[in-house]
């Protein structure tokens, strides 16, 4: 089983990110589960969502404490939470940022992981460029597919289009493809 924890803030599409990830996995014939963890928080408050992917039925229902991958949609959370808590040795880290890991103050931890398992991509900028809104979730889904190899881009494309129709879907797919290509090139 591959387990993903997504950290962000309310309004960034954290819950939708896990839903689209699980849809993409399902479209590839896998079993998947997506669920959020939040209370009555408002826009801007920290939110966590989870996704499990496996080739067999998933019976677990609890939050993911030991993820194989973490996606950080908002790097300001580094000061508020230990977003890396429980990350599996050799796990994957995808961060929405154009800043260096040194500037973010996380390079020492990330140096303990395989270099090809760690990447930052300016997903918010890609979302603004392609969708016109600062919601990085679809772009980060493209980056996730590239860094982990767990999903094919065609499944990511289909999952995004299932969630968002028309021009919004097209823009989100374009942002996801740009992130996918940026992560592959990194």
Predicted region positions:
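Active-site cofactor/cluster-binding pocket
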Residues: 1-186
């Amino acid at each position: 089983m591959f387990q993903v924890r997504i950290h962000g803030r309310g309004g960034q599409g954290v819950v939708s990110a896990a839903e689209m990830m699980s849809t993409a996995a399902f479209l590839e014939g896998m079993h998947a589960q997506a669920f959020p963890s939040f209370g009555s928080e408002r826009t801007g408050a920290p939110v966590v969502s989870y996704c499990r992917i496996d080739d067999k039925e998933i019976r677990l229902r609890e939050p993911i404490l030991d993820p194989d991958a973490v996606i950080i949609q908002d790097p300001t959370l580094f000061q508020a939470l230990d977003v890396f808590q429980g990350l599996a040795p050799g796990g994957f880290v995808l961060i929405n940022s154009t800043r260096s890991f040194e500037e973010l103050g996380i390079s020492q931890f990330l140096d303990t992981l395989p270099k090809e398992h760690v990447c930052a991509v300016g997903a918010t900028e890609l979302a603004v460029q392609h969708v016109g809104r600062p919601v990085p979730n679809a772009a980060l889904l493209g980056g996730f597919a590239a860094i982990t190899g767990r999903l094919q881009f065609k499944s990511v494309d289909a999952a995004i289009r299932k969630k968002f129709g028309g021009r919004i879907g097209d823009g989100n797919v374009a942002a996801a493809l740009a992130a996918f290509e940026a992560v592959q090139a990194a």
